[in-house]
Amino acid sequence: MAQGLIEVERKFTPGPDTEERLQKLGATLEHRVTFRDTYYDTSELSLMLSDHWLRQREGSGWEFKCPGVTGVSGPHNEYVEVTSESAIVTQLFELLGSGEQETAGVAAVLGRLKLQEVASFITTRSSWKLALSGAHEEESLLTVDLDSTDFGYAVGEVEAVVHEKAEVPAALEKIISVSSMLGVPAQEKAPAKLLVYLQRFRPQDYQRLLEADSSGEATGDSVP
């Protein structure tokens, strides 16, 4: 993904007929893949508590998701996705305040920034592309991902990618429309894979995120 694009996404709980509904809507199955995601944070969860998410995806490299548009309510999220390692390192040093920045890749600065693995799991994903209202441009397509994890959790996501904040409301309308056509209840909020992983395997960290969310310090439902 190009640097600085804004992801607008909504998670949902897939049903037994979700793929059939996608086919009836004219969606195209792009691929089925299996990959491992590993998330990193400090022991104090400094990144997650500020709604920043550092992930290394097997075969794809590093990705850092930062808060995007604010002030748009509802069961959806907006993130700016950073994939350039130099840009990720710059933002990590700014957030974690660890002195003079190094010129190095992400893996090389994990120790200095006291970042450690907090979650690692395997996902099997079927990824679909769907055009609405006859739109055929690549950036007008919506992506629908259906994921199942090696710890027994399944979740779906409808995603649009835009360049500017002004484009977010229109993208959100498309996401809401597709979600409705897939039979997703209007206010459904399906938890992210990472949150469910923490709830099951690191309950103390999960509780810290919930407490911060309830106090307005973090957004527990907005895990990418």
Swiss-Prot record:
Q: Which residues bind Mg(2+)?
A: E7, E9, D145, E157, E159
Q: List-wise, which residues carry N-acetylalanine?
A: A2
Q: Name one GO molecular function term.
A: thiamine triphosphate phosphatase activity
The protein's required cofactor(s) are namely: Mg(2+)
Q: Where is the CYTH domain?
A: 5-201
Pfam families annotated for this entry?
CYTH (PF01928)
Q: Which domain of life is it from?
A: Eukaryota
The alphabetical list of record keywords is: Acetylation, Cytoplasm, Hydrolase, Magnesium, Metal-binding
The Gene Ontology CC terms held by the record are: cytosol
Q: How does it assemble?
A: Monomer.
Q: What protein family is recorded? A: Belongs to the ThTPase family.
From the Swiss-Prot or TrEMBL record, give the protein name: Thiamine-triphosphatase
